[in-house]
Amino acid sequence: MLEQMGIAAKAASWQLALLSSREKNQVLEKIADYLEAQTDDILRANAEDLAEARANGLSEAMLDRLALTPARLSGIANDVRQVCNLADPVGQVIDGGLLDSGLRIERRRVPLGVIGVIYEARPNVTVDVASLCLKTGNAAILRGGKETWRTNAATVKVIQQALQECGLPAAAVQAIESPDRALVGEMLKMDKYIDMLIPRGGAGLHKLCREQSTIPVITGGIGVCHIFVDETAEIAPALKIIVNAKTQRPSTCNTVETLLVHRNIADTFLPALSKQMAESGVTLHAAPSALPALQNGPAKVEPVKAEQYDDEYLSLDLNVKVVADMDEAIAHIREHGTQHSDAILTRTLRNANRFINEVDSSAVYVNASTRFTDGGQFGLGAEVAVSTQKLHARGPMGLEALTTYKWIGFGDDTIRA
């Protein structure tokens, strides 16, 4: 089955690579329109997935990732339209010039070919990936989690209808609907057809892909994110940022999981934090350095366990640790962070610059929420993933991350001397 999907996807990718920006945008507009026109069908499939997920005891964080609503689906359709408005990187000349030999050389952006994506309970990923791949002239083979197979199937059906309406092969976007886990292992060996593989899920999935894939893999998306409250931070705006970073949507990978507080501000800051977290329903997991200032406050407090510093909670839980100085804060982030998103709250430019230079994450913030690490927020449009590695892409992966380049030489009957 996968062999035939790979053959069809590769053939579709050659056709997609030749489309003009106008033609690709027409497809995307059609997809957005069809998503809205067939909202009821997609939501019906999603409701069935949700019912089965609840019966199987999925956590509230996972259920939130799985759920679609009319508003969320409308937002997904609008995200597709936003991709239409983005500049098409395909065909862009990156650099070049005339060589001494008389050869004119240029480096030009081209599609990667076929993108494989393995993801868990995030039905929006289906549309995000499809829209970005189509905009960049790539075909896509998608393998969503078993929790969302009905939603994914309904969504891909809509996308394929739009493709065929525009005279393009349905195989440009395909989904592996079978829940058979053995197919994941088979997909990881499809380097003959798939040019890049992107896993979006937990640490286990990323480890599996790194160890078993014969396809180049982009890993990331696991976010043990930190905020360091410097001694010069202002309490009121700092609390506002922390509430946003923890509670706006706790199930996302750019949510803060550990708060590091400079000891010189801790006695004033931690009681205010406890009050704010109690109002927000956040459970604090306190280090011994933070526990005395928090245990009599209104927020629910538990002693932190050492292994929790490595946890991506995806829930209303927050580790809190008082640190002696920035050295200790940076050391903690280096030991426990996942190079996703980390922030410093400070009013000192020197401290801000030091944090920027010494914290090796794909996104580093000064006086801002970690929740901004997102393709849409960065002006990239919908993202295909957030990469925490350094090759071939880093941070939110927008359109350019789904392209490669080729060297083109123009001669006048030119030969090498």
UniProtKB/Swiss-Prot annotation:
Localization annotation: Cytoplasm
Pathway: Amino-acid biosynthesis; L-proline biosynthesis; L-glutamate 5-semialdehyde from L-glutamate: step 2/2
UniProt keywords, alphabetically: Amino-acid biosynthesis, Cytoplasm, NADP, Oxidoreductase, Proline biosynthesis
Domain of life: Bacteria
Catalytic reaction annotation: L-glutamate 5-semialdehyde + phosphate + NADP(+) = L-glutamyl 5-phosphate + NADPH + H(+)
Record PROSITE patterns: PROA
Enzyme class, UniProt record, top EC level: oxidoreductase
EC number: 1.2.1.41
One matching Pfam family: Aldedh
Family: Belongs to the gamma-glutamyl phosphate reductase family.
Protein role: Catalyzes the NADPH-dependent reduction of L-glutamate 5-phosphate into L-glutamate 5-semialdehyde and phosphate. The product spontaneously undergoes cyclization to form 1-pyrroline-5-carboxylate.
Name this protein carries in UniProt: Gamma-glutamyl phosphate reductase
Originating species: Klebsiella pneumoniae (strain 342)
The encoding gene: proA
